């Protein structure tokens, strides 16, 4: 059963919505003869993707009550919960050498994202409605204790594609995570072999590029398009679909009348006709799934540049104009404003959850590091209507709950993002944070020492902590807490206990002395800072310092004396996310299981 492409999706109550992943459509069959995984064209996929079979075979006893079993899904290389890496799985699909296949399977295993069930315990499910099949599929995953939604960090290679009722929220997440799109499915649809159905609709997250026509291919009518890159024409692909018949005919006629040369295959024209094309991504330097969107008669061909093409690939909010994108921001780093905006776009899925529903203080650098910065708490009068605010103690703070607001702030050159320890809805602390701030970068080892000592205590108390760099010269340790349970008076008992513990372990390294002149070269343990109204720099926020630092989340196993704060900058933060994932990925799930209550009771008893 195949979905039909739509450009206009009507939201209806009798439909459900799923993330559309980009990989290989695959049917998993498991019966007495073994496990098979076949593509839509009935091609065996296990030779290229043995990790699926290797994962399932040891679980045969667990699966036995449900066999024979047949599942419908998409074989993908998950990049994040809403996006699969299309180009990477294409490489996997073309790999033939057994050694290379084994290396890929071990290092970057693919996952089968299951969205339908066709046979369960030998009983066909085709006659059931999609709603019924989805319920049975969810029940199966529950019984197996398998992930009920996408998790790129889970070792489980069989994961459920969750069905959502709320299209808007799902679409917001797909756009935020740069996913391919959404599949809409009618609740009462039946599964029909090989049929392209109007009861399943695919709605894609298009990107847009302004380009010009360079040639017409005679045999198939494809229009070749390009952009200017450093003064020369750079081809980016060809387009055929999306034109109305009269538009296509007029365009072909114009090209023939204005050709500069032709050969047996092409009719060539000078750059003159500008148009906008929507596409999914750039794959092998060509537009993937290009469709004509509109003519851009107001554009000059010289305005269709490779730079704007790459910039717009990141799916920035359409109605936001980025001003002065080539403005340099750092003296000793080749970082322009466009680079900073694209950085914010890429880290937004990981940064926004920490900004959500928190009053925001930003530090703006209107001239980059070449001029004076200033703090901004009050929302400026010129802020657009989509920027939401919250009044607190007479100040109308910005609340950054979405990508559009974040990019708008980035365009205002808000480099640093500082947030309180509670949300606007919290009655008490949302987390505990220890700010381990040594006197200088040269004493960074003191922050490492303190962090490792705190980790020992957390482990002994069965508490879960997360660690990040401050982006300057220190480390910060987070303990997520359930909302509306603990007061700041409660958390003060714990922060002062930890401060006293550190000093008792090494009074020559740590101090709670408020006066800087009396601290010497010791690390100041600022447990007083963790209180209502105080702030901390948000995870993934950049810092206005000479090394373009980033408040970078770390894995605990990385925290040792080889760490140095200047190694954590914009470039390294992006590289780490792409290669290692987000160390704070389980942060918010930890809130409900953090066993802080028993620890607090002991501290209160000793008070």
Where do the model's predicted regions map?
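Active-site palm subdomain of RNA-directed nucleic acid polymerases
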Residues: 457-468
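TRNA-binding/sensing appendages of the translation machinery
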Residues: 10-36, 44, 315-371
